[in-house]
Amino acid sequence: MPTWMLLFCLLCVTSSNLSSALEDNCKTFSTTLPNMLRELRAAFSSVKTYFQTRDKLETKLIDKSLLEELKSYLGCQALSEMIKFYLEEVMPRAEENELDVKEDVGSLGEKLKALRLRLKRCHRFLPCEDNSRVVKQVRNTYKELQEQGVYKAMGDFDIFIGYMEEYLTMHIGK
């Protein structure tokens, strides 16, 4: 048998196994989600005090309007945009400017990336396209806070985890 045919057969077998593994992964998501959120909270606890003690502003970055939007038809997009906001804006800035906690913030980011990847693979959790006005407001406030924005955003990360948990728990039963 030619080598290319053997490789093609191997690819077909591997891709079907991968596809069924991904489906199984989504079937068990409701049982693994609490552990993923617990790991996210544990990773955040290692930097929580650092950022919250440096947050001297009374400005609210994350409030109940985000939770309400997560519960609305835009929930999927709001969650997707908030994860992107933390991964692409907040955490890189926190790692760059706060060398004392760089490694811990990096670890927190990796856990959030793993959760995002899992959510994207299981389409029923993130099947969305519309833009979120609340997340836009969060981003605008973050930018207005300039240097203090990173402390505010990282200090509020636990609120975001709680809201994310509510959104995901609401969708597991569907």
Swiss-Prot record:
Subcellular location: Secreted
Gene3D superfamilies: 1.20.1250.10
UniProt keywords, alphabetically: Cytokine, Disulfide bond, Glycoprotein, Secreted, Signal
GO molecular function term, any single one: cytokine activity
Cleaved signal peptide residues: 1-16
Keyword set includes Acetylation: no
One GO BP annotation of this record: immune response
Annotated PANTHER family: INTERLEUKIN-10, INTERLEUKIN-19-RELATED
Protein family (similarity comment): Belongs to the IL-10 family.
Protein name: Interleukin-10
Lineage of origin: Eukaryota, Metazoa, Chordata, Craniata, Vertebrata
Gene name as annotated: IL10
